[in-house]
């Protein structure tokens, strides 16, 4: 893994900083674990935009990831590491003795030829998956389940990790990078280690077109629109919008509370927004 700054042979190349990964597989993904994927471009079943500034982008195929890690006690061998266009982390193709192959999220320290296993008696080693009750305190973990058997939902993006802070009865207490501390049932599974591609946030795309390849469209200011498109739109010449900042639907922005339920979960001990 290395950061490479391109030579300014054109305005679009001048500010590009790439993260180079020579260890990644250069061929096609494993076909039986690939599905076609249709973009909905942030439209709902009525065709209305639910999230602005999405659309276009390069065609992607979805890689089926094993988030449950339910092959108990069977040691698998990592055949290769791969790029996945659907997530910031890298993925690893694991071959099991029965001939089955599965994709998993690749943590730091797992490479071609590494052995990974899932189960209560699995050693504490990057890539292995255990119930939280079998992981020692202070361990760095990722791919954390919220409900037993549902599959990992937390800490899955590049460079992410959490720490097992304590165990209290049937619960384990997890400390997130965001500052949030929460309780999770101790029978839920988690994987050891930190997610790969930790330099993902250091890259620079360099030009607007690189954003478009990823399905991100321009962010247009409300005051630059027409009155039909935004409450701040219209006016002769440049205007300030003429009112307090609002969203396209007229809701006050910049700190206005829209959530009705004040408490998100009784499992959260320390909120990530509290200083």
Curated annotation (Swiss-Prot):
PROSITE patterns registered for this protein in UniProt: RIBOSOMAL_L2
GO molecular function terms listed in the Swiss-Prot or TrEMBL record: rRNA binding; structural constituent of ribosome; transferase activity
Pfam families, sorted: Ribosomal_L2, Ribosomal_L2_C
InterPro entries reported in the protein's UniProt record: NA-bd_OB-fold, Rib_uL2_dom2, Ribosomal_uL2, Ribosomal_uL2_bac/org-type, Ribosomal_uL2_C, Ribosomal_uL2_CS, Ribosomal_uL2_dom3, Ribosomal_uL2_RNA-bd_dom
Keyword terms of this UniProt record: Ribonucleoprotein, Ribosomal protein, RNA-binding, rRNA-binding
Biased composition range(s): Basic residues: 209-219, 254-263
Record SUPFAM superfamilies: Nucleic acid-binding proteins (SSF50249), Translation proteins SH3-like domain (SSF50104)
GO cellular component: large ribosomal subunit
Region (Disordered): 208-275
A GO BP annotation: cytoplasmic translation
Subunit structure: Part of the 50S ribosomal subunit. Forms a bridge to the 30S subunit in the 70S ribosome.
PANTHER family recorded: LARGE RIBOSOMAL SUBUNIT PROTEIN UL2M (PTHR13691:SF5), RIBOSOMAL PROTEIN L2 (PTHR13691)
Family: Belongs to the universal ribosomal protein uL2 family.
Stated name of the protein: Large ribosomal subunit protein uL2
Lineage: Bacteria, Pseudomonadati, Pseudomonadota, Gammaproteobacteria, Legionellales
């Amino acid at each position: 893994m290395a950061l490479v700054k391109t030579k300014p042979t054109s305005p679009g190349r001048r500010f590009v900083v790439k993260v180079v990964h020579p260890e990644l597989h250069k061929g096609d993904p494993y076909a039986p674990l690939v599905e076609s994927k249709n973009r909905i471009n942030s439209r709902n079943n009525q065709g209305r935009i639910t999230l602005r500034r999405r659309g276009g982008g390069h065609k992607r195929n979805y890689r089926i990831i094993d988030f449950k890690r339910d092959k108990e006690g069977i040691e698998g061998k990592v055949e290769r590491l791969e790029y996945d266009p659907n997530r910031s982390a890298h993925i690893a193709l694991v071959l099991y003795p029965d001939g089955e192959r599965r994709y998993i999220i690749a943590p730091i320290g797992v490479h071609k030829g590494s052995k990974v296993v899932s189960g209560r008696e699995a050693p504490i080693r990057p890539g292995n998956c255990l119930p939280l009750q079998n992981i020692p305190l202070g361990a760095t973990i990722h791919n954390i389940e919220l409900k037993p058997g549902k599959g990992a939902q937390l800490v899955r993006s590049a460079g992410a990790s959490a720490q097992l802070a304590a165990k209290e009865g049937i619960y384990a207490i997890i400390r997130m990078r965001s500052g949030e501390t929460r309780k999770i049932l101790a029978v839920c599974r988690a994987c050891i280690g930190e997610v790969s591609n930790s330099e993902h946030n250091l890259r620079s795309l360099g030009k607007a077109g690189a954003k478009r390849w990823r399905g991100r469209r321009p962010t247009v200011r409300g005051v630059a629109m027409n009155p039909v498109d935004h409450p701040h739109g219209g006016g002769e010449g440049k205007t300030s919008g003429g009112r307090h900042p609002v969203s396209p639907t007229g809701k006050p922005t910049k700190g206005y509370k829209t959530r009705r339920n004040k408490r998100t979960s009784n499992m959260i001990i320390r909120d990530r927004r509290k200083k």
